[in-house]
Amino acid sequence: MMTAESREATGLSPQAAQEKDGIVIVKVEEEDEEDHMWGQDSSLQDTPPPDPEIFRQRFRRFCYQNTFGPREALSRLKELCHQWLRPEINTKEQILELLVLEQFLSILPKELQVWLQEYRPDSGEEAVTLLEDLELDLSGQQVPGQVHGPEMLARGMVPLDPVQESSSFDLHHEATQSHFKHSSRKPRLLQSRALPAAHIPAPPHEGSPRDQAMASALFTADSQAMVKIEDMAVSLILEEWGCQNLARRNLSRDNKQENYGSAFPQGGENRNENEESTSKAETAEDSASHGETAGRFQKEFGEKRDQEGKTGERQQKNPEEKTGKEKRDSGPATGKDKKTITGERGPREKGKGLGRSFSLSSNFTTPEEVPTGTKSHRCDECGKCFTRSSSLIRHKIIHTGEKPYECSECGKAFSLNSNLVLHQRIHTGEKPHECNECGKAFSHSSNLILHQRIHSGEKPYECNECGKAFSQSSDLTKHQRIHTGEKPYECSECGKAFNRNSYLILHRRIHTREKPYKCTKCGKAFTRSSTLTLHHRIHARERASEYSPASLDAFGAFLKSCV
């Protein structure tokens, strides 16, 4: 036992001494650097946080030969992984996203890896967006609608050579290629997944077979791979009156027209629903129509009472034919039997939806018994019936296509006055519907209802195929196109179809070569705002590169001390 302990102490003493000396040296260096970086001048606040790519490369390039044993190697590897993934800040989903992104970049062709290294996307979605924009840029260099798929990308990848660099690539691409071309180091086994820019083989020359193979690996021959990527990409162009709400607005307008047709059925029981679906301006218009209807009812009820009065007088002449009770029922309406506007009415006699109060005889105590409540106004085009002539007039606009209500600001016309009132809020900026939870305001009540589902977590629209739920019916419709393969949005230039209108808008910029998003620093333009945001990181890294590697190491040591 003593011999084993002595041998263990003897065998480990040199290593322990080296470890101790190494720790002391590292500690002194860290303290000196911390004093230099975090000391009296407080220059830390001006130092930007280091790029996570630096820690990732340190983790991937770590070698066992640089340690004194397996335990120290494992400990150092954990430390480097901790600095890269930062589990004290990032969630599990974010850490998984980083790992998936790294693997996704590693399976891309070499030339695309070099290009993406300039942008360093933070997620797989950002990488996909960049690749889609790359295809748009490369497609824009060709004659629109003539070249697609592998042939298009193969032609576009030729300018990746530093000598023939294309203007559609980043301004720093030439420097990256030059630095990479002169590098003589070869990647180790542990580096094969990371594929840093300094270890990726040089891109092929023009017309090489490898270039064609790379293009075929990314895009299939029938150009369907790009569509799959589009299905995974996030919806990019979302506006309050954008394409996502188009179907919902049309449906809402149709529902309003149908509600007008069902207003006043059997006495007008659906009045409350109509009041919710129409605007204040249209309500005033309806009130006038209701007043006319009420006047017509009063006239008919008065004639009915006169007829009943005469009948009662005739019946009173023959008392032997009826009992006293029957005489009272068939007699003229008295003050007790008659409900007027000044008197109190029972709940069954208030007549929802009649607009104005009017007197009713005892023989017509409920709205269901009103004889004029039938749908007497019929549409000649489709045969649909309505209880009011005003509802029929509104309905006929569907067939005639008439849009009498025009906006004075932009000239846009509408078939209903209520739709014009809602549209004018775009110009006035009025947002009367406010969320009680966060205070955010909306111009449409329907948008407020959709917003409140964010707080409640309600997702009432579920896919029958996969069970995935959505908070908006339009999102469910878009999702179901993945199962059905429907692509209703077709390009008029080249005939290519898409399952979302936003994708068609982006695709049209290939033909128009429109790039509305421009960088204010270097003047480079992009087709998407998200790509411009990623481009800004290049300028941010230029500012960060002004700091020495020692400052970045000191910052990493500071992060470690804060854990």
Swiss-Prot record:
- Cite the location of the cross-link Glycyl lysine isopeptide (Lys-Gly) (interchain with G-Cter in SUMO2) from the record: 27, 181, 228, 280, 299, 304, 339, 375, 412, 440, 478, 560
Q: Which intervals hold domain SCAN box?
A: 56-138
Q: Which intervals of the chain are annotated as region Disordered?
A: 1-23, 31-50, 257-373
Give the GO molecular function terms. DNA-binding transcription factor activity, RNA polymerase II-specific; RNA polymerase II cis-regulatory region sequence-specific DNA binding; zinc ion binding
Return the Basic and acidic residues bias intervals: 270-289, 297-352
Keyword DNA repair applies: no
Which key words are in the record? DNA-binding, Isopeptide bond, Metal-binding, Nucleus, Phosphoprotein, Repeat, Transcription, Transcription regulation, Ubl conjugation, Zinc, Zinc-finger
Q: Where in the cell is it found?
A: Nucleus
InterPro entries per the UniProt record, alphabetical: KRAB, KRAB_dom_sf, SCAN_dom, SCAN_sf, Znf_C2H2_sf, Znf_C2H2_type
Chain positions with Phosphoserine modification: 13, 208
C2H2-type zinc finger segments: 377-399, 405-427, 433-455, 461-483, 489-511, 517-539
Keyword Lipid metabolism tagged: no
**GO CC annotation:** nucleus
Domain named KRAB is located at 227-300
Name the job this protein performs.
May be involved in transcriptional regulation.
Quote the PANTHER family the UniProt record gives. Answer: KRUEPPEL-LIKE TRANSCRIPTION FACTOR, ZINC FINGER PROTEIN 384
Report the sequence similarity comment from the record: Belongs to the krueppel C2H2-type zinc-finger protein family.
Quote the protein name from its UniProt record.
Zinc finger protein with KRAB and SCAN domains 1
Which organism's genome codes for this protein?
A: Pongo abelii
